[in-house]
Amino acid sequence: VQQRQRWFGVIALLFLIVIAYADRVNIAVMLVNPDFLQHFQLGGDRAHQGTLMTVFLLGYGLSAMLLTPFLETLMGYRRALTLSVVLWALLTAASPLAGSLMLLCVVRALLGVSEGPLFSLKTMYISDHFAADERGKPNAVSALGVSLGLVLGFPLVSFLMAHFGWAMSFHLLALLNLLLGLALVRLFVHPLAWSSSSRPTDPQPVLSRVWHTFALAWRTPMLGWILLIEIATLSYLWGSSSWLPAYLTDEKGFSIKQMGWMAALPFIVSIASKYLGGVLLDRIRPYQAPLIFVCGGAATALCIYGVMSSHQLGWIAFFLLAANACWGAQGAAIPTLLQHYARPEAVGSAYGLINGIGNLFSAFVPMAMGMVMASQGKVSSGFAVLIASQLLTLLAGGALFGRMLLARQMKRA
């Protein structure tokens, strides 16, 4: 029964990530809605359009990095997830009430703050409930929520926007977040009685305990190399999901309804590849895991180059699908490597560090892509930034493999 219950928690976290990502991509879909663009005076301004995702990611990154140690030390993942869901639902509902672009940016930044600890809290749950040689699959399954959220998010927001208008779509998403999100957390996400998330209250002062957790996270071995890979991975995610709708509508002539499903297709493929990546992780030794980044990064970069240089729709679709398959296969390796190295009482904060800093850096990718597009006059030209991100994955993965192999040989000697 306990075996089944811990997997219920993983599935609940998967769907929590699904609704969070559906909530995040609504801005990417809004950028092809003339009424939304006119309301916030964003028409034709690619750089300012990219800023809407950038401010969200800045709030998200700072929260993941700085707020997670407080939540891990003082609340545990169940109560922290409950608070997070309530806040992000309220902020989603408040988004259309913003009377100016500046106010919308503030709301988006606060939304990022409320969602920032989500992946760190998920990592804490899996570390509590699964042994070291079992974490590949639950990490992969829960991470499927990213792709599934994008798969469902693009057509869902497109449908809501087409039938209820852009403003009402925010309110309906907020209601979905609140009702479904709270039900998932309260019914299925439970800490173990002996876990680090439910340990007795420490008599030390609060700030001292939080600082101790934060310091342990910073001292995680191989943290720098894993961080570089996280930056590159998130750069690809946010860059591609932010601009794929505009690429399909503005450059390829799809309608908004067609765009919703076409934008989702590449992320459907990454669902299967993420799970396969998790299965592979449980069958190889930890020091071999970085090879997934080397092979996946090289293959993804080549596929994105294929998207940029192809003119036939069939080849463009093939390269988009292949790129996301190769990118998706890398997904579970990052938290699995971190769980291998981080101290159990600081694993959430360690993931918060790399996820937070990764999002802070990748926050500027949508804006950078918008600037490249503005200078070159084509949406696809901005995809060169995605190629650079995957080349960084390749190089950092190779360096991490070398370091881990050397550490293993020294330990055996």
Where do the protein language model's features map onto the residues?
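Juxtamembrane intracellular "pre-TM" segments in multi-pass secondary transporters
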Residues: 1-2, 193-226
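Extracytoplasmic gate region of multi-pass secondary transporters
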Residues: 28-29, 221-275, 331, 335
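Conserved MFS/SLC helix-loop-helix module at the cytosolic interface between two early adjacent transmembrane helices
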Residues: 62-99
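Helix-to-loop junctions at the C-terminal end of transmembrane segments
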Residues: 63-76, 275-286, 373
